[in-house]
UniProtKB/Swiss-Prot annotation:
Pfam families to which the protein is assigned, alphabetical: adh_short_C2
Chain sites annotated for binding NADP(+): L28, N49, Y181, K185, I214, T216
Family: Belongs to the short-chain dehydrogenases/reductases (SDR) family.
InterPro entries attached to this UniProt entry: NAD(P)-bd_dom_sf, Sc_DH/Rdtase_CS, SDR_fam
Protein's name according to its UniProt entry: D-arabinitol 2-dehydrogenase [ribulose-forming]
Enzymatic reactions: D-arabinitol + NAD(+) = D-ribulose + NADH + H(+)
Length: 278
């Protein structure tokens, strides 16, 4: 048995790697992109609104230049911004190809945070809304995974896919009437298992990170002035609080690392403060 430092202590550095983050202008992507940049990765942000995504990319790079000084200065990578509807397979494929060409390397880390939730009672859920959320959350997760994996397979390169699921993919969180969101996230979790089995032979690991309630800017706006809603949510969490976005960074770095999680694939990592325990 080799007990050398490198063989025992996991390495979370991402030097030389290119990470694609969908939903790139969102609250969760903001902290994830900074963490990946700090670990030496190049980062490509994708979202629907190009100007908002460019602004997010500029903020991330500015943060890197200000924060990663001294011994880490040389580790600051590139940050690029792209516009794409992940529910459009052809657009996804073209965007991923452009990203690889722009950065001069093939992306080997994908983090899909894109997706949305909406509430309608099941008996009155509009068909067009149901189709739309399944196209983005469900098919979009497949399209980005497919376009990411193809060049890796063609060039015999390894990679890691992290699809953001939700605790709502395995439980029904009362009192929100969000059956189609729950269905879409359940689909993401099982998609991950399927892709993990198919692509293990190509050294492409596929995992789900399923959050509970996160205090993103959007969530803060929703609960602002609604004390009863906030208290109702938190009462069902054993830790009695919602998560800060930064509390998901460790899980992302674990699943991204080729040493820490080299034998982890097809897994649904739930980070929910214990919500599912009750």
């Amino acid at each position: 048995m080799d007990y050398s430092y490198a063989n025992v202590v996991p390495n979370f550095r991402l030097d030389g790697r290119l990470a694609i983050i969908t939903g790139g202008s969102g609250g969760l992507a903001a902290v994830i992109s900074r963490a990946l940049l700090a670990q030496g990765a190049d980062v490509a942000l994708i979202d629907m609104n190009l100007e908002r995504t460019k602004s997010a990319a500029k903020e991330v790079l500015g943060w890197g230049e200000e924060t990663l000084k001294g011994e880490h200065a040389s580790a600051i990578g590139q940050v690029s911004a792209w516009s794409c509807n992940i529910g459009d397979a052809e657009a996804v494929d073209a965007t991923f190809s452009s990203i690889n060409e722009h950065h001069g390397k093939i992306a080997d880390l994908l983090i899909n945070t894109a997706g949305y939730c909406e509430n309608f009672p099941a008996e009155t859920y509009p068909a067009t809304n149901a189709e739309s959320i399944m196209k983005v959350n469900g098919l979009g997760s497949f399209y980005v995974s497919q376009s990411f994996a193809r060049p890796l397979i063609q060039n015999n390169l390894r990679g890691s896919i992290i699809l953001i699921g939700s605790m709502s993919g395995t439980i029904v969180n009362d009192p929100q009437p969000q059956c189609m969101y729950n269905m879409s996230k359940a689909g993401v979790i099982h998609l991950v298992r399927s892709l993990a089995c198919e692509w293990a032979k190509y050294n492409i690991r596929v995992n789900t990170l399923s959050p509970g309630y996160i205090l993103t800017p959007l969530t803060r706006n929703v609960i602002s002035g609604h004390t009863e809603m906030k208290e109702a949510w938190e009462s069902k969490i054993p830790m009695k609080r919602m998560a800060e976005p930064k509390e998901f960074v460790g899980s992302i770095l674990y699943l991204a690392s080729e040493t820490a999680s080299s034998y982890t694939t097809g897994h649904n990592l739930v980070v929910d403060g214990g919500y599912e325990c009750w």
